[in-house]
Curated annotation (Swiss-Prot):
The protein's name in its UniProt record: 1-deoxy-D-xylulose 5-phosphate reductoisomerase
Lineage of the organism: Bacteria, Pseudomonadati, Pseudomonadota, Gammaproteobacteria, Pseudomonadales
Sites where the protein binds NADPH: T13, G14, S15, I16, N127, E129, G213
GO BP annotations, alphabetical order: isopentenyl diphosphate biosynthetic process, methylerythritol 4-phosphate pathway involved in terpenoid biosynthetic process
Cofactor(s) listed in the protein's UniProt record: Mg(2+); Mn(2+)
Domain of life: Bacteria
Protein's pathway: Isoprenoid biosynthesis; isopentenyl diphosphate biosynthesis via DXP pathway; isopentenyl diphosphate from 1-deoxy-D-xylulose 5-phosphate: step 1/6
Gene: dxr
Source organism per UniProt: Pseudomonas putida (strain GB-1)
Binding positions for Mn(2+) per the UniProt entry: D153, E155, E229
The keyword Metal-binding is annotated on this UniProt entry: yes
Length: 396
């Protein structure tokens, strides 16, 4: 019998990371945790290390590393502690690693995810920002290295499952007419537009269907999450933005659909639980038990669909415009959104101001080519500086 696959989980203490470890723990004969990373939740990372006994753990700073080393020693756990971006890149590209779960949220996940790609790993991509920021460079690295890129976002994983195996030949060549990206509409789908001025971070983070971290919950509430997913879908499936349509589907049971030229529409259904796409990607091309309950169609009884309201969700419009503009526009969009969401969570701006701030930054920052990773981070930094300048003028 072959040895278990060694998995690095980047972002182990987050929602995706914990779900990944849940699936791994269900199949100890197939998978083992090789390395786990965490950001601010050092105590939670300690507990995960004690339970899963990885070879390495990665934290952001020397201070956090010293604290974790002392705690691991006291617990009798031999996990080696690394720190910073260099540590993340090391465990993402290590020769012993078979697959990498890339689940660090935001721009911070780009370099370690790219390190895994360049090392030719099987990369389970939950960090959509990596593709949004550096799509052309990222996909070229995938082609050059021979890495296997498998999407973890439930929507992109659904599309992947509904696509023919040779979709890389081009959507037209395999008879795909369009991709239908489903969205729940979030907690404010029916909130009067004028009432959005007064919604709180707690309300924005109370998603009706999914359990997620705070940043992605706010992105879901603003539908920026769907906008970022639209951009990601364009890169993953080599689709023009016009070929990707967003459909609001409140039940979050159909995770996305692929429309073919012969009139067939293939959909992937399942309970809203991230362990399904995680298990699908971990085992691909095989199937394993994820721990998710079977879908009860009789309990669901109905499936509803509606067009997205761009007056209520201007972030979706901004993301589509950025996708169409290409070059640096998606990286600028992403950076401005990260700053805006953080400001909203800190109660420095109101919910509708997230889109207002992003739009102003997009208007101010010219669209330029991004020929290198340095150029990507330069565009990201300029957008963050413009965003902070906007906050100084307009924030509370």
């Amino acid at each position: 019998m072959s040895r278990p696959q060694r998995i690095t989980v980047l972002g182990a203490t987050g929602s995706i990371g914990l779900s990944t470890l849940d699936v791994i723990a269900r199949h100890p004969d197939r998978y083992q945790a090789f390395a786990l990373s965490g950001y601010s939740r050092v105590d939670e990372l300690l507990a995960l290390c004690v339970r899963h006994r990885p070879a390495f753990a990665v934290v952001p700073s020397a201070e956090a590393a010293a604290r974790l080393r002392a705690s691991l020693a006291a617990a009798g756990c031999a996990t080696e502690v690394l720190e910073g971006e260099a540590g993340l890149c090391q465990v993402a590209s290590a020769a012993e690693v078979d697959a990498v779960m890339a689940a660090i949220v935001g721009a911070a996940g780009l370099r370690p995810t790219l390190a895994a790609v360049e090392a030719g790993k099987k990369v389970l991509l939950a960090n959509k920002e990596a593709l949004v920021m550096s799509g052309a460079l990222f996909m070229e690295a995938v082609r050059r290295s021979g890495a296997v890129l498998l999407p973890i976002d439930s929507e992109h994983n659904a599309i992947f499952q509904c696509m023919p195996g040779d979709y890389a030949r081009g959507l037209s060549a395999v008879g795909v007419r369009r991709i239908l990206l489903t969205a729940s509409g979030g907690p404010f789908r029916e909130t009067p537009v004028e009432a959005l001025l007064d919604v709180t971070p707690e309300q924005a983070c109370a998603h009706p269907n999914w359990s997620m971290g705070r940043k992605i919950s706010v992105d879901s509430a603003s539908m920026m999450n769907k906008g970022l997913e639209l951009i990601e879908a364009c890169w993953l499936f080599d689709a023009a933005p016009a070929k990707v349509e967003v459909v609001v589907h409140p039940q979050s049971v159909i995770h996305s659909l692929v429309d073919y030229v012969d009139g067939s529409v293939l959909a992937q259904l399942g309970n809203p639980d991230m362990r399904t796409p995680i298990a699908n990607a971990l085992a691909w091309p095989e199937r394993i038990d994820s721990g998710v309950a079977p879908l009860d169609l009789f309990a669901i009884a109905r499936l509803d669909f509606q067009a997205p309201d761009e007056q209520r969700f201007p972030c979706l419009r901004l993301a589509r415009q950025a996708a169409e503009a290409g070059n640096s526009a998606p990286a600028v969009l992403n950076a401005a959104n990260e700053v805006a969401v953080e400001a909203f969570l800190e109660r420095r701006i109101r919910f509708p101001e997230i889109a207002g701030m992003i739009e102003q930054v997009l208007d101010q920052e010219p669209v330029v080519p991004l020929p290198s990773l340095d150029a990507v981070f330069a565009a990201d930094q300029r957008a963050r500086e413009l965003s902070r300048e906007w906050l100084r003028r307009h924030g509370r």
